[in-house]
């Protein structure tokens, strides 16, 4: 049985001029149009495809990669609005519908929105919802200290950045622990710093532990880790630039 809205590895059963048919199980054959068929494949080979409904409501396959699959959050741009709802650009030929009931506020063409991709419980079609809170923090946050997690940057607040952890929970990265600007929609790795008594979760972009270097040297080392080993400053950089990044004097920077 195929999973709608997710990646499936399926076997080719027919090769025709307009594409190939894939074995979807239960006597279901799914078309992979010719434009998406990998080179040199033949009946019996397996291909990884994304499964969704086309504009006619038929189950269809593609090797194109959507911005998000069912069960994931992402920032997406609104391409159009009609009497059905708003339609988002998500990397496929068919745009992604956000029904009016799933909009926090009326969506406007050209604006970007944080949405959750899911299957409509009535139509079983893939849709998106901007009412993301109802899809988060629904299970206890069972994380260990320093556990590596996947993060999606949701938005910036006065004290830091709100992030979505493993497509399950809200988390927060504090401004004083970040050494570059984060962008909405950015995916990155993080580490669980603390799950508080109220189940709010603090996250760090660097691994924590007793081996952590203290002082200015530790701050610089953390920044290097976040920036993949490169910083746009050195001992000849202006003192103002060094202070803006690390909150220390040029002399302290050199000593570190």
Where are these regions (language model features)?
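Single-stranded RNA-binding regions, centering on S1/OB-family and related RNA-binding modules
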Residues: 1-256
């Amino acid at each position: 049985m195929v999973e709608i809205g997710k990646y499936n590895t399926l076997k080719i059963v027919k090769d025709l001029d307009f594409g190939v048919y894939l074995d979807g199980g239960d006597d279901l054959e799914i078309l992979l149009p010719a434009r998406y068929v990998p080179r040199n494949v033949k009946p019996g080979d397996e291909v990884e495809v994304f499964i969704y409904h086309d504009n006619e409501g038929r189950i269809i396959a593609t090797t194109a990669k959507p911005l998000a699959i069912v069960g994931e959050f992402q920032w997406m741009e609104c391409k159009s609005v009609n009497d059905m709802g708003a339609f988002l650009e998500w990397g496929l030929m068919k745009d992604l519908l956000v029904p009016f009931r799933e909009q926090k506020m009326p969506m406007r063409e050209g604006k970007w929105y944080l949405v959750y991709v899911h299957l409509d419980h009535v139509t079983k079609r893939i849709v998106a919802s901007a009412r993301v809170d109802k899809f988060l923090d629904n299970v206890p946050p069972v994380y260990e200290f320093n556990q590596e997690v996947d993060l999606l940057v949701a938005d910036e607040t006065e004290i830091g950045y709100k992030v979505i952890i493993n497509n399950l929970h809200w988390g927060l990265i504090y401004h004083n622990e970040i050494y570059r600007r984060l962008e909405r929609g950015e995916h990155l790795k993080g580490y669980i710093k603390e799950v508080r008594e109220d189940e709010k979760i603090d996250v760090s972009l660097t691994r924590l532990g007793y081996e952590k270097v203290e002082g200015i040297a530790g701050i610089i080392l953390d920044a290097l880790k976040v920036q993949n080993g490169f910083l746009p400053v050195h001992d000849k950089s202006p003192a103002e630039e060094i202070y803006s990044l690390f909150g220390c004097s040029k002399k302290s920077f050199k000593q570190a």
